Swiss-Prot record:
It is found in: Cytoplasm. GO terms for molecular function: aminoacyl-tRNA deacylase activity; ATP binding; isoleucine-tRNA ligase activity; tRNA binding; zinc ion binding. It comes from Pyrococcus abyssi (strain GE5 / Orsay). Its EC number is 6.1.1.5. This is Isoleucine--tRNA ligase.
């Protein structure tokens, strides 16, 4: 049976700890999964968070969304695959471990600690953070298979990556190439395009104008502009646009006459910046400059430039390129094929060498600045050019520049040999499959995704690092390669392993090989340096592994099948794949969402997921990013500690549309906490009265209960709510779901329905009217708790256990089915009518306040003026509710006669009728009523005809003194404020009832406790109160009311000129 609640006040911490203990002791999570094991499969793929540290509000928001979806689908009957994942390789972890070990370079890693120990430390770091993050996710009430997470470091996961790369190789989509790529000089590795997107940050760099002497022409120069002086040693050409107009300008510079060539459109801007005046002496198209040779300004400092000039026809000449713009610079672009993507492409067209005299740390390997880091060389190069007379102007520019997403070092463009997935060959396939098979939430993100695919280049997947999935590429000395697709294949092809520099031949038998491998290397581990030891033989050639590891974005990109253990475990893959739903943050549109589709098209020629949703970032209240430097970071634990898990969860799903950025607000958190407190208070009210009366819904036949209109209304509303919440979740418009729930709890249930039924709950005995209210409230909770369960699982469980479970025999609210709409219960007309009733009550209450009539004092009558038929029907059908809520003896639709004063509107008459305005005004003063009633008239005045409308008059109305009015959407409420003795006596009785009830509450009396009341007050009050003694006794559960000296627990109430005493009647 229903019991009185354990906590009368909502205490999230106590409640949630209690529920957590109940779940744990009763293995509810396991039972929920067991219950749905035969349901239709639903593959929810968890995008793996990176294990670089503790979770933040954004990570929490992501997991809360996921948990809500999983709980919702489970209640719908699905057997949900809910395996959490962790992204555990990559440079961010390497960087953290390097810092912990005091290492700064790859050389130090290899020489001071060794690759094997370094990888061991990375693994320890990753596993430790996994444990921390798992506990944090559990703290948020996230129900996933925490005992069986997928980890990108597991052998079977790595093998999935090898399988995918082998498929790419077999399809001709994996190849080695020399390209200009983003390079991190600190991490000493290449970065893929998608890793750099979003990593452009403001920084200051040099901004210099430099002149290149035209060969064979005295004092004639090509004028170029650059922000990367360090690339000038690698300059091999100057690019011009074939269709632009260029000019030769005569200038006076440093005391001598010179001729500068630049784009015509930029002359004024460039000369203005430099601070010189010029005269155009010649004009030509860009294509006419093609082949013009110049003298390399650092030929002596970088002797290989002499070799290039002799060997390559187009070295140190003007070449043509469409990428040249007039947005900035001079219209002539310094071109270094070893340091620019577009430079590389045009260089290939003209047969130029790819020259990049840098090592992996971004230091020069030759020439004047050998051994110096490029950014440190910038000022030295600028000063050197100044000394040589080639520097025209040096300044600074603040611009967005790409940085390493792992260590935040400024990147450089550098030509290197790398391994590529040829995404350019499958772009169209990705877009086609995506458009046909994937549903996006919101749908406009699909366009952004498609555009990102169109703009993407080939995927550089090799990284020159340690802690990652080893590239499964083995290469012979003569350059032939073989891609290994699995551990078994590697063992089968292996002929030897190398241990500490010693080659150990392997036997032919697979089983015998495994014994030797385990004896010499230990158990299977597909990481470096374990796999580096394997020497395989293909086509009669020994092959050793290419030392690179795979881009960490590839790890997560294969998650939809690698997490299922495919291809080692085909059964799960065949049952579940592709994923039914994924959801991640906005930055993943061109990252994880992209890497998955790219990898999946390579492996399976189709998409890896059916539905995908995007959410925004969490910012602070002002809209700023949370960061240590700003001191505005709020940790998830802090929110849970202050407000509770349910509040945190609901707030994150309620505060903003999921695809927008969430500006975290403590005020908003508190607002949600109040909503849950309101829900708790309604539960306390219901369970308190139901427990006293031993209420059992099973003993009642709802067909025989005398439901009132308000009961039918709330049952209709809660059934409408099912659709609102469900549609909100299905469309990923989560705020529609949460705000519908919020408004239902606060407005419909608490502020309206409970307000309407309070008196019915107070009645003693087996009253049918009270039982109808009980049954309605119980039924509402039965539906509402199931709707709330995915959002606020703790409070839903606690209320369910006491209010609903005694009559269902279902162990947990999370084991219930998602509610189905009872179409018979929905009455849309009643819902519309009740909405008008609430507006009328609000307007009527406002009118009473203006008249300074307290709600406890009844009024004689209220008149509703309206033209709206729905309002008229509502007032008739729900008249009892209006009378009760407005404390009025009579409420009816009608018209209140008032005195109208009609005056001319000179603001309109003057401009329109000018000199005739006065005679029209005189006519309005005499006949204005007719114009008001008809709306418009054509009248003849002094022989002239005028067309008049209501715009030409001002109407002032004067109500009878005993009326006060207020407008509402649909009409107007008129309250008769005349107070008779009878009304005053009734109001005074209510005033005393409220104070006695307050005293009962202060004494913490049970609702069934009887009392004796003594009242010490004025003679006038005594006479008035005697007229309603039965009412006072009934409402306060008093056995007797005595007028005289107050006794027992006494409180003085000056506002009613009384002292009241109450004493509990002892049984």
């Amino acid at each position: 049976m229903i019991k009185e609640p354990e906590f009368r006040e909502y205490d999230p911490k106590k409640l949630e700890e209690k529920v957590e203990k109940f779940w744990s002791e009763n293995e509810i999570y396991r039972k929920v999964k067991e219950l749905r094991k035969d349901g239709p499969k639903y593959y929810f793929l968890d995008g793996p968070p990176y294990v670089s540290g503790a979770i933040h509000l954004g990570t929490a928001w992501n997991k809360i969304i996921k948990d809500m979806i999983i709980r919702f689908r489970t209640m719908q009957g699905y057997n949900v695959w809910r395996q959490p994942g962790y992204d555990m390789h990559g440079l961010p972890i390497e960087v953290k471990v390097e810092q912990a070990l005091g290492l700064k370079t790859k050389k130090e890693i290899e020489e001071k600690i060794g690759v094997e120990n370094f990888i061991k430390k990375c693994k320890e770091f990753a596993l430790n953070n996994l444990k921390i993050m798992t506990e944090q996710f559990k703290m948020l009430g996230i129900w996933m298979d925490w005992d069986n997470p997928y980890m990108t470091i597991k052998n079977e996961y790595i093998e999935s990556a090898w399988f995918t790369l082998k498929r790419a190789w077999e399809k001709g989509l994996l190849e080695k190439d020399k390209r200009v790529l983003h390079w991190c000089p600190r991490c000493e590795t290449a970065l893929a395009e998608h890793e750099v997107r979003g990593e452009y940050k403001l920084r200051k760099d040099p901004s210099i104008y430099v002149k290149f002497p035209v060969e064979g022409k005295e004092n004639e120069y090509l004028l170029i502009w650059t922000t990367t002086p360090w690339t000038l040693p690698a300059n091999l050409a100057v690019s011009a646009h074939p269709d632009y107009d260029y000019v030769k300008v005569k200038v006076e510079f440093n005391g001598r006459e010179e001729y500068w060539i630049l784009a015509k459109a930029l002359v004024d801007k460039v000369l203005g910046e430099i601070g010189v005046k010029g005269e155009v002496v010649e004009e030509f198209k860009g294509r006419e400059l093609e082949g013009l040779r110049y003298v390399h300004i650092l030929m002596d400092e970088y002797p290989r430039q002499k070799e290039f000039k002799e060997k390559y026809e187009w070295a140190h000449r003007v070449i043509l390129a469409d990428f040249v713009t007039l947005e900035e610079g001079t219209g002539l672009v310094h071109t270094a094929p070893g340091h620019g993507e577009e430079d590389f492409e045009v260089g290939q067209k003209y047969g130029l060498p790819v020259y990049s005299p840098l090592d992996d740390q971004g230091k020069y390997t030759e020439g004047k600045w050998k051994g110096i880091y490029v950014k440190e060389a910038d000022p030295k190069i600028i000063e050197h050019l100044r000394e040589k007379g080639y520097l025209v102007k040096a300044g600074e520019i603040e611009h967005k520049y790409p940085h390493c997403w792992r260590c935040k070092t400024p990147l450089i463009f550098r030509a290197t040999d790398q391994w590529f997935l040829k995404i350019s060959k499958v772009k169209d396939k990705i877009i086609k499959e995506n458009d046909e098979k994937v549903t996006w939430y919101p749908d406009w993100v699909k366009i952004r995704f498609d555009n990102g695919v169109r703009d993407s280049g080939d995927w550089v997947i090799s990284r020159q690092r340690y802690w990652g999935i080893p590239l499964p590429i083995w290469q012979s000395e003569d350059g032939e390669i073989y891609v290994v697709g699995s551990w078994r294949e590697l063992v089968e092809l292996a002929v030897a392993i190398e241990v500490n520099g010693e080659r150990i031949e392997l036997p032919e038998s697979y089983e015998e090989k495994l014994k030797v491998i385990e004896e010499k290397l230990g158990p299977e581990d597909l990481h470096r340096p374990y796999v580096d030891a394997f020497i395989i033989k293909v086509n009669g050639k020994d092959m050793r592994r290419v030392k690179d590891v795979v881009d960490v974005w590839f790890d997560s990109g294969i998650a939809s099948w690698a997490s299922l253990g495919y291809p080692r475990n085909k059964e799960l893959f065949e049952k579940l794949w592709p994923a039914d739903f994924i959801v991640e943050g906005e930055d993943q549109v061109t990252k994880w969402f992209y890497s998955q589709q790219a990898a999946s098209i390579v492996a399976f020629d189709t998409v890896p997921y059916r539905r995908v949703a995007m959410h925004g970032y969490v910012l602070d209240e002002k809209g700023d990013k949370m960061s240590k430097s700003l001191g505005n970071i709020i940790r998830p634990e802090e929110v849970v500690e202050r407000a509770g898990r349910d509040t945190f969860r609901f707030y994150m799903l309620w505060a903003t549309n999921p695809w927008e950025n969430l500006k975290f607000s403590w005020k908003g958190v508190e607002q949600v906490r109040r909503m849950l407190n309101i829900l708790w208070n309604v539960y306390v009210l219901a369970s308190t009265y139901m427990s006293l009366d031993n209420f059992d819904p099973r003993k009642l036949n709802p067909d025989e209960l005398p439901f009132r209109e308000e009961d039918k209304w709330i049952l209709s509303r809660v059934n409408s709510l099912i659709s609102e919440v469900e549609n909100g979740i299905e469309s990923f418009y989560l705020t529609k779901a949460t705000r519908a729930l919020y408004n239902f709890v606060v407005e419909d249930l608490s502020r309206w329905y409970v307000r309407l039924i309070r008196k019915r709950l107070w009645v003693e005995g087996e009253d049918p009217d009270k039982l109808a209210a009980y049954y309605t409230l119980w039924k509402v909770f039965d539906v509402l708790l199931r709707l709330l369960a995915p959002f606020t699982p703790y409070i839903a469980e606690e209320i369910y256990q006491n209010l609903i479970r005694p009559f269902t025999n279902v162990e947990s609210v999370h084991m219930l089915d998602w509610p189905k709409v009872d179409e018979k219960a929905i009455d849309e007309e009643l819902e519309r009518e009740m909405e008008f009733i609430r507006r009328i009550v609000e307007a009527g209450s406002a009118a009473r306040q203006r008249a300074k009539i307290k709600l406890r004092y009844p009024v004689r009558r209220i008149i509703i003026e309206t033209e709206d038929e729905t309002v008229k029907k509502a007032v008739e059908r729900l008249n009892r509710i209006l009378r009760d809520q407005l404390n009025a003896k009579e409420v009816k639709v009608g018209r209140v006669e008032r005195e109208l004063t009609i005056k001319p509107n000179f603001a309109k008459l003057g401009p329109e009728f000018k000199g005739d305005a006065k005679i029209i005004a005189k006519w309005i003063n005499e006949n204005g009523r007719e114009l008001y009633e008809k709306g418009e008239l054509t009248v003849e005045i002094d022989g002239k005809t005028f067309h008049l409308t209501r715009e030409h008059i001002i109407v002032e109305e004067k109500l009878p003194d005993f009326f006060v009015s207020e407008e509402f959407e649909g009409g107007r409420v008129f309250v008769d404020k005349t107070l008779t003795r009878e009304l005053i006596a009734e109001g005074l009785a209510r005033e005393f009832v409220r104070r006695i009830q307050e005293m009962r509450k202060r004494l913490d009396l049970d609702v069934n406790d009887r009392i004796i009341v003594t009242i010490e007050t004025t003679d006038e009050n005594v006479e008035l109160l005697k007229e309603n003694l039965d009412y006072i006794m009934r409402e306060t559960r008093a056995d007797k009311i005595v007028f005289g000296k107050a006794k027992g627990y006494v409180v003085e109430w000056p506002e009613v000129q009384a002292k009241i005493g109450i004493e509990k009647v002892e049984e």
